[in-house]
A protein has these predicted regions:
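Short, surface-exposed patches at the edges or C-terminal ends of soluble domains, predominantly
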Residues: 1-242
Length: 242
């Protein structure tokens, strides 16, 4: 039987909806080809029934309890959580995302990253990078991502050690606040097998950008996660999120 990864696309914090045909119909339509089932979820508790949880431009800050719920999901239950922001702290998006991200040792900077040299179609805000360190292989373990385009992205500040680079800008990428162009990063929970991924932009997988370079493959690779079996008090393994 072909493995299926169940993805909860949250709308619990007024995120961009994946069912918005104009913006996200491609990722929703193509997901099954990559073994992904994407559901829009409006119940906080229900989110944690899935393998991967996506917060795509949340507009409501996370409460302390919600942060602890997400920490438990990643560190104990082995879930994958993806949090995506935007450049320049538009609508205080960096501040909002950081109410959750700093629990995993990262923060979004309130800056903008541009690249006058490595970009799409001469637009410096459509930052192109070949420095894709993670999620560059498909389920067959073959490389299917060589470059991505990340439009309107901010950078990420690491505040704890052991953060993994997912995508960094090229040497020509610049921050208007002179920050290092770390654009997408991972926190890995080695015991549970969980992940927390933070991205400086939420539009690299919209209907326009997902057609650029290898963005489609990168998006699908990043969404994929298989929740590891967890041990119960009786010593029997169970699989969450299936």
């Amino acid at each position: 039987m072909k493995k299926i990864c169940r993805v909860a696309w949250s709308i619990t914090h007024q995120e961009f909806t994946v069912t918005d045909y104009y913006y996200f119909s491609i990722i929703e339509k193509r997901a099954p080809e990559f073994g992904l089932q994407i559901d829009e979820v409006d119940s906080w508790d229900k989110l944690f029934e899935y393998d991967t949880i996506v917060f795509n431009y949340p507009e409501i800050p996370f409460t302390e309890k919600e942060v602890q719920d997400v920490v438990k999901a990643v560190e104990e239950l082995g879930k994958k959580v993806i949090l995506l922001g935007y450049y320049k702290n538009e609508d205080h998006i960096a501040d909002t995302c950081n109410t959750l991200a700093r629990a995993f040792g990262m923060e979004l900077n309130p800056d903008e990253i541009t690249d006058e040299v490595s970009n799409h179609d001469g637009d410096k805000y459509f930052v192109k990078s070949t420095k894709v360190r993670r999620y560059n292989k498909g389920l067959d373990n073959k490389v299917n991502v060589n470059a991505v385009v990340l439009p309107c992205t901010c950078s990420i500040k690491t505040i704890m050690p052991d953060i993994k680079i997912v995508v960094a800008g090229e040497e020509t990428a610049k921050s208007n606040m002179e920050n290092y162009p770390l654009l997408i990063a991972d926190h890995i929970a080695p015991v549970s097998g969980g992940y927390f991924t933070l991205a400086g932009t939420c539009v690299f997988w919209d209907n326009y950008a997902i057609r650029l370079e290898d963005n489609l493959n990168f998006a699908m690779n990043m969404l994929w996660h298989e929740t590891p079996p967890q041990d119960t008090p009786t010593g029997k393994a169970v699989r969450f999120g299936l």
